[in-house]
UniProtKB/Swiss-Prot annotation:
Organism: Clostridium botulinum (strain Kyoto / Type A2)
Gene Ontology CC terms: cytoplasm
Record protein name field: 33 kDa chaperonin
Entry-linked CDD domains: Hsp33
First-listed, main subcellular location of the protein, grouped into a coarse class: cytoplasm
Length: 296
């Protein structure tokens, strides 16, 4: 099933929905970072959440960054997303892996940890970005985001995120949804949706059966006048470049850069998001010193 993200409403706008299949997107992120199974599930859930939330941005220049740091062996997960559905991310420890939890599922909470915070950072080109922060609720990511929306944005929300890792460590299925009750929505409607979400199969199970994201949402919102508003293709895409890495190298400061120039013949930097390596020769480091600090 091809990746697809849709935005929809139900019950005459009382409910706002963003849903997506993200199997290929997550597969690419997991491949780039060579993740162990539990790390793959954690990164995949965050990438899916980022893709969903990024589409709420107003401008293509805006960015949304999700960070979760719970003190666990995952060493944090960071994802940055954009309005057009493209997303990038990394996990601090891609080899993080532990035994399944009591339900036989990959123990994402176990590697994330619960001693920390979930941050949502919206950079809309203003002087300061908007930063929302809540304590980690369960470490399962979906429940943490639902808690964030309810506490930080006062929007009752249900967030479902799923990643099914195959035996060969590829991603068999991945996807998710964010369901939000709009101001003035019928409380009984919220109860009905909550009941349905408890009764349905997992989103990865539905994707594995070949259901499209539209069919999944139709199944959840049967008899609720689901109205699909728009659709896009979410994608894992890193926008790193040699120029950006050069600026990052220059930003460490004149003193540290001079030490590198004096001590090494070559400096290699890797992009956090895609692991692409950029090598700078001794002469190139000297040129950076000269162009940024008029020193060599």
């Amino acid at each position: 099933m091809k990746d697809k993200l849709v935005k929809a409403i139900a019950k005459d706008g009382q409910v706002r929905i963003i849903g997506a299949i993200t199997t290929e997107l997550v597969n690419e992120g997991v491949r780039l970072h060579n993740c162990a199974p539990t790390a793959a599930a954690a990164l995949g859930r965050m990438l899916t959440a980022g893709a969903l939330m990024g589409t709420t941005l107003k401008s293509e220049k805006d960015t949304l960054t999700l960070q979760i740091h719970g003190g666990g062996i995952a060493k944090g997960v960071v994802v940055t997303s954009y309005a057009d559905g493209h997303v990038k991310g990394y996990i601090g420890n891609p080899t993080a892996d532990i035994e399944p939890n009591s339900k036989g599922k990959l123990d994402v909470s176990g590697i994330i940890g619960k001693n920390g915070n979930l941050l949502v950072i919206r950079d809309m080109g203003l002087k300061e970005p908007y930063i929302g922060q809540v304590p980690i609720y369960t470490g399962e990511i979906g429940e943490d985001l639902a808690y964030y929306y309810t506490v930080s944005e006062q929007t009752p929300s249900a967030v479902g995120l799923g990643v099914l890792v195959d035996k060969d460590l590829s991603i068999k299925s991945a996807g998710g949804f964010i369901i939000q009750m709009m101001p003035g929505a019928d409380e009984m409607l919220a109860d009905l949706i909550s009941y349905r979400l408890e009764e349905i199969p997992s989103i990865t199970e539905m994707i594995s059966k070949g259901m499209t994201i539209e069919e999944i949402l139709e199944y959840i919102f049967e008899d609720m006048d689901l109205n699909i508003l728009e659709s896009i293709v979410p994608e894992y895409r890193c926008d790193c470049s040699r120029e950006k890495v050069e600026r990052a190298l220059a930003s460490i400061g004149q003193k540290d850069l001079k030490e590198i120039y004096d001590e090494v013949k070559e400096e290699e930097l890797k992009c956090h998001f895609c692991n692409k390596a950029y090598a700078f020769s001794h002469d190139e480091i000297g040129n950076i010193l000269e162009s940024y600090y008029n020193e060599k």
